[in-house]
Amino acid sequence: MVAVIIKGNEVAEKKRAQLTEEVVKLKEQGIVPGLAVILVGEDPASRSYVKGKEKGCEQVGIYSELIEFPETITEERLLAEIDRLNGDDRINGILVQLPLPKHIEEKAIIERISPEKDVDGFHPISVGRMMTGQDTFLPCTPHGIVELVKETNLDISGKHVVVIGRSNIVGKPVGQLFLNENATVTYCHSKTQNMKELTKLADILIVAVGRPKMVTADYLKEGAVVIDVGVNRLETGKLCGDVDFDNVLDVAGYITPVPKGVGPMTITMLLHNTVESAKRAGVVCK
């Protein structure tokens, strides 16, 4: 049995087409979804991510505003800019591209964004609502992962999900989202002593650790759904995930590739959150 490849880029395109239709209908009502992205400094990776977000907005018809600051900006000035955007009715979503310079406290910046415009889903209020199963903006990568698993038509309820990784951005929240779908969730991390025993119990295995090709066939139960969140660059320049793709291909039931797996879904769910925010606000742009 060779695993079915879950092509995240194709799933993302399908969802973006749906978002485009929604945006057209909103514009007919005078509502134009708007996203503001704040970029601090000249980090090439951050700039690349921001370009992807701008391109996504253009594709589905979302108004986007890029606000750039030098790396020397003070925390006070950045907070003031967020305050301005919180009060701007044209803007439904605010995203601050991370990481920030060391002299700026990321926690303070994230918490300054209005929860009603927190389309990244990082604000503690958004996280609390997610934990308690309330309607909120879900963090983009975890949300995208759940949507990819749903593409397999697997009934998540009652399944055993094992998450390798416990970051606040992916590992912790993705486990919570699967718990909200009535799955049984196990977390593995650097201190887990019997990891392979646990991962072999997984109907769905999520790998988000940043270690190239760490997960091999002996980690898997036959037929498992494998979602590879890692993006690592080898010395050859080639990208690879945290899963040894070729090694597990004959054991997994479904698997996401790297690239064109989870990555395209992250920006797509950001666009989804921005459109949802515009719907909630119901603001007419003049």
Swiss-Prot record:
Keywords: Amino-acid biosynthesis, Histidine biosynthesis, Hydrolase, Methionine biosynthesis, Multifunctional enzyme, NADP, One-carbon metabolism, Oxidoreductase, Purine biosynthesis. CDD domains: NAD_bind_m-THF_DH_Cyclohyd. GO terms for cellular component: cytosol. Catalyzes the oxidation of 5,10-methylenetetrahydrofolate to 5,10-methenyltetrahydrofolate and then the hydrolysis of 5,10-methenyltetrahydrofolate to 10-formyltetrahydrofolate. Homodimer. HAMAP family: THF_DHG_CYH. This is Bifunctional protein FolD. It comes from Bacillus cereus (strain ATCC 10987 / NRS 248).
